[in-house]
Amino acid sequence: MAVVRLPDGSERVYEHSVTVGEVAASIGAGLARAALAGKVNGKLVDLSARIENDSDVAIITEKDAEGLEIIRHSSAHLLAHAVKELFPEAQVTIGPVIEDGFYYDFSYKRPFTPEDLAAIEKRMAEISTRNLKVERQVWDRSEAINFFKNQGEHYKAQIIEAIPGDEDVSLYSQGNFTDLCRGPHVPATSRLKVFKLMKLAGAYWRGDSHNEMLQRIYGTAWTNKDDQNAYLRRLEEAEKRDHRKLGKQLGLFHLQEEAPGMVFWHPKGWVVWQQVEQYMRDIFRNNGYLEIRTPSVLDKGLWERSGHWENFRENMFVTQAEDREFSVKPMNCPGHVQVFKQGLKSYRDLPLRLAEFGSCHRNEPSGALHGIMRVRAFTQDDAHIFCTESQVQDEAVQFIDLLQKVYNDFGFNDILVKLSTRPAKRVGSEEQWDKAEEALRSALNHKNLIWELQPGEGAFYGPKIEFSLKDSIGRIWQCGTLQLDFSMPERLGAEFVAEDNSRQIPVMLHRAILGSLERFIGILIENHAGALPLWLSPDHAVVLNISEGQADYAREVTEELRRAGIRAYADLRNEKITYKIREHSLQKLPYQIIVGDKEVAAQRVAVRTRSGSDLGQMTLPALVDRLKEEIRTRAGAA
């Protein structure tokens, strides 16, 4: 007999063991038709999973987030099935769910083409209409390895060989296609109706450039056409906002092959950079941070003591000089500990907040680079707070206040928060972890924030809070971090004199608000579609004369604006005014100041915003006041 407890608190008693699908059918025919999978005692399982004992059971449908994930995972297998039917010699490797979709990696003798992609998608639709039953079986490990080797699927055999001995080897079959997977999957291929293949890319097997380059096919899958169409519209909008395209169009920066993952900032782009950096410098200065500067190249020995050499070596740029091995720093924390160690510190000196616009380099795989969003050379608004355990909560609260102010000033008001707690492998005592997690949890609750718990997702050296922004088209960008560290201060010999004269090790809080300045500027460009708020714009205004007769007055107006601290320039070219207006509108310039004979006679200017709004004539002092107020309040784009 099995007692099944449902999410609404009701119970159902079954005389014999029962499958999840049978539970759904006993509740109602409608639920049985809608069911995709189940959750038994918190674990996702197939509808065919058998319930032998008393259990908590939930039926998963497409209305559940897990339901959509199962649809996407099953769609990845549908993709692999279609590829094997069309290209029997292709080898399948892995096909996970990703944000908004899935991908599958294949090994094949020639590159897939866009025409292949269309044919594969068509075959996926055909397989869906066959309504093939999807069945799970647990296989003997050696039999599964031999099965895939006999099929010529050597990558699958490798994957099985790497599965821990205490885990089941589960295979899923639909028609004549069998794949390795933990599951769960939809019960039949007919449940997969809304999908689209998106693009092709390359990917190394196991992410190692020494291995074969595989072909990755990306796809998306949804529960209904409306959701898919909305997603495709978002993609179109994101394409228009692509910071790489806008960076070139607006003359902000460029990248080139001779310096992969490293940005060439142009004058206009560097103005934006300086505005962001100076804003953050003021934030540091006004909130008790001491700005420092540490070396970019440090001896291998320091990286060995910090643990980076063992855990991060493959991402570090290494060089040699005078028989010594050095690394360009991938992060700033070891250098900050060295500054803390200079001179004996007392508990009265804590908390000590050290900040740096730290220039870091990481040897990211070339395939992972993406404009200025994912680079090899970047600058962080980095800071480390050295404090006692009892100070952690107050420091966390102050940091959250600061982070919210910064994000609001940059126009981001929708912030997602996640707290990651102790992983299985960790340093520090249970008491330390209890105190640290409670301090961060209390700080979040003190600020009345809605936050998500991520059990076991903390770093081995301490729990952390992650802060993500939602942009104007609904995309999520993880930027801010507050990371507690029990390990590095001890590894690098940091200590302070406590009130009882004992030597103690400080807690170290790694914290960043923007993260990488390059990436954050990329986010700003895409969030505003290139039309940055006035205070961040490379130029605030351009002065346009209608004809040669107003050139001198246009120069005077430009000089007055510059003297008032407005970033302005004059366009005195002998072109039609409509041509000049259009050209500067495409450059997303916030204000166009137009002067003709009427404006010269009245000693006024005609003002137009980049959105096309005509503000009419106004005096120059009135215009200056308007611009200064907009800059002061960091108002949105004109």
Swiss-Prot record:
Organism lineage: Bacteria, Pseudomonadati, Pseudomonadota, Betaproteobacteria, Nitrosomonadales
Organism this protein belongs to: Nitrosospira multiformis (strain ATCC 25196 / NCIMB 11849 / C 71)
Region annotated Catalytic, chain positions: 242-533
Pfam families in the cross-refs: HGTP_anticodon (PF03129), TGS (PF02824), tRNA-synt_2b (PF00587), tRNA_SAD (PF07973)
The name this protein goes by in its record: Threonine--tRNA ligase
Cofactor: binding comment: Binds 1 zinc ion per subunit.
Keyword annotations: Aminoacyl-tRNA synthetase, ATP-binding, Cytoplasm, Ligase, Metal-binding, Nucleotide-binding, Protein biosynthesis, RNA-binding, tRNA-binding, Zinc
Assembly description: Homodimer.
Similarity-based family: Belongs to the class-II aminoacyl-tRNA synthetase family.
Compartments reported by the entry: Cytoplasm
E.C. number: 6.1.1.3
